[in-house]
A protein has these predicted regions:
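Non-cytosolic membrane-interface motifs at loop->transmembrane helix junctions
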Residues: 83, 173-184
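Bulky hydrophobic segments
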Residues: 2-171, 191-203
Length: 203
């Protein structure tokens, strides 16, 4: 088995790592297009670029591209795309629009009342949803001067809510656990960025 076969099997595994690898190519493509367009714009304007900020913006664009493809496209879309590219089209079973479900009761309440057991998969999903949005909170202070301690909490709660409201439309599910963990991830990322910026100023 060669390297490409190994990567393909990992992509088709349905694991978090596999889903991440599925969107790496489109993320890199968008990043390259953005970098070229941004470079040409700066060159045309004849202004000096703050390369630290520009790199942060590029990384943020790549991150957003990956995030959108992970949470705002129908389930299994990229799985079928990669299967088609490798094996040819054989039909697909993407969830129909407006077919998602709703979970409005947080897992910790279900666990507290004894109606739910937090297994390994649930813990992985909870931690994954937190970690997935840490870069969002981290990049924002570097790419936007409008983000501050007064509005980061509003942004942190509104963004996950918007994402979750859209998910049932594309056949996914609204999950209050995702809203909570995404919010925590954004706030954690923001304060990590605040700490990093403070260290940079002292250096």
């Amino acid at each position: 088995m060669n390297v490409l076969d190994t990567i393909y099997q990992l992509m088709m595994s349905g694991s978090i790592v596999g889903l991440f690898i599925q969107v790496v190519p489109i993320t890199c493509l968008v990043g390259v297009i953005y970098a070229i367009c941004r470079y040409n714009k700066i060159k045309k304007q004849g202004c000096s670029a703050m390369w630290g900020t520009e790199i942060m913006r590029l990384l943020f664009v790549c991150y957003l591209t990956g995030l959108i493809n992970l949470v705002l496209v129908p389930n299994n879309l990229w799985t079928y795309i990669w299967f088609y590219l490798r094996n040819g089209y054989s039909g697909c079973e993407i969830a129909p629009l407006f077919s998602g479900g709703f979970n409005l009761v947080p897992t910790f309440l279900k666990y507290h009342t004894g109606e739910f057991t937090i297994g390994r998969w649930v813990r992985t999903m909870l931690v994954g949803n937190l970690v997935m949005f840490v870069p969002m909170g981290f990049f924002l202070p570097f790419v936007s001067k409008k983000i501050n301690p007064r509005n980061i909490f509003a942004f942190g709660i509104l963004t996950p809510i918007v994402v979750e409201v859209l998910q049932p439309i594309i056949g996914r599910s609204f999950d209050i656990d995702d809203v909570i963990m995404n919010f925590v991830g954004i706030i954690v990322g923001y304060f990590i960025a605040v700490g990093v910026k403070a260290l940079i100023k002292k250096a």
